[in-house]
């Protein structure tokens, strides 16, 4: 089909069905593709993808979710680095960090109002890279494209930073392995294929919990459904912060990495597993760490109350702020 002209005089394929960006929308979106390598604002109220888009039909793509506070995206460099790693695993074109960084900055200058919280004005910012439509259906061969979106952080997420979450231990269902052992399994890549993660959350929520922590058949702790696991142990003045060992099918967490770096500078010792359920039950604190939720204390595990020190949570949140 023939290309169409937007009001901004930018030629784009008709299959994107674009209109000019509407500032009254709660979400703000920038599209980057072959025709618009630097990105253009698009209207999020109209279809932006083809019906045969492989990101939509197969989950064939990668993404990053970030937190913006007062229009500044936290840990942007770390997220772009992980996005590049994920794209490489899927044989997608390497994202260009400077172009993406510039597009994110433009997005945040124009984004609609975020959520007002104790931290300031907060937005969720997502970068999605899709493989694009299948060549068998479309003759245009537009190739992979990128969407960058900003929207207000939901109040329910902010609430969990202080009130915490109830978690359940669930078996992963398969033994994790070194990330490089079977590259076609995409271990360690942040892909669009999140159906299992969402099914896990529905499963635990139907049983009165908020989140899940995966364990192996040997009961070794892995990670949350959409988060990293942090565990604190304080004894005789010695403070140690643990997380499960990396490179065993665990997605490297940018939030976990930021907290660890600040804790190290503050004199904490760091440990990288292995961790088992008993370590969590006997700890001085357990948290689920992710980019937008930040760190949420786990108040109950399998129905059993865990140690929960609000001051310790505040300390770790302060460490995270230092690394942003």
Q: For each of these PLM feature ranges, what is it?
A:
Residues 101-136, 151:
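Short, acidic/charged, Gly/Pro-enriched secondary-structure junctions
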Residues 11, 16-19, 109:
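Position-driven detector of the extreme protein N-terminus
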Residues 20-98, 102-106, 135-324:
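Helix-start/capping segments and mature chain N-termini
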Residues 8-12, 180:
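Residue-level detector of transmembrane insertion/anchoring sites
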Residues 5-7, 22-23:
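Intrinsically disordered, low-complexity polyampholyte segments enriched for Lys and acidic residues
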Residues 3-5, 13-14:
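Short linear motifs in low-complexity or flexible loops
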Residues 3, 117-119, 138, 157:
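Generic marker of residues within folded, mature protein domains
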